[in-house]
Amino acid sequence: ENGKTFKVSDKVTVENVRYDNRFGITVAADMYLPKGLDTTKKYPAIVIGTPYGGVKEQGAGIYAMVLAERGFVTLAFDESYNGESGGEPRHVSSPDIFVEDFSASVDFIGTRPFVDRERIGAIGLCGAGGFAVTAAQVDKRIKAVATASMYDISRADHYGWKDSMTKDEY
C-alpha cells in the first residue's frame, strides 16, 4: 500500500513530506497524524529513524503509525543517502549527517502549528538508535529518546566490533 510493507491503519492519515538538513540534503519522510486531528490543539510529536539500510516504509513507518493511533504526531524519515532522501553517493554511512537528520526532522515537525514544541521525542531503530541518542545529547529540543535494538555505529567505528581494538590500534 503506497510502497509500504504494512497495511496503513484507517485511524491515521499519512502525508509524504520533504525538508532539507543543514548540509543541504533533502530528507524524505512520512508524517502520520491521528485521524480527526484538531489543528487548534497541540500534540506531542516523535521523529523516528530507520534501521541502517532500512526505509521509512518498513519498521519506522509501523512505529510511526501505531504511535499516531495513540495520539502522537509522528515522522518516519529516510536518513540521507538512503531511500527517497537525497545525497550522493547512495547508501553511504555518515554518523554526523544521520544525527543532523534527526535535528532537521525536529525542525520540520516543530513548525507544524499543531505540535507542542516542548514535547518532541525521538526513536532510533537499530543503527539509528545511536544517532537518536547523540541527537538528544546535542539538540535540547528532543525531550525524550528511545531506542529499539540499538547498535552504536560510531563506537564500533572508533573501538572496533565489540570493542575489539586496543588503544594502539585506535
What positions do the PLM features span?
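Conserved alpha/beta-hydrolase
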Residues: 66-86
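Glycine-rich "HGGG/HGxG" loop immediately N-terminal to the catalytic nucleophile
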Residues: 58, 81-93
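The serine-hydrolase catalytic nucleophile loop
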Residues: 53-65, 79
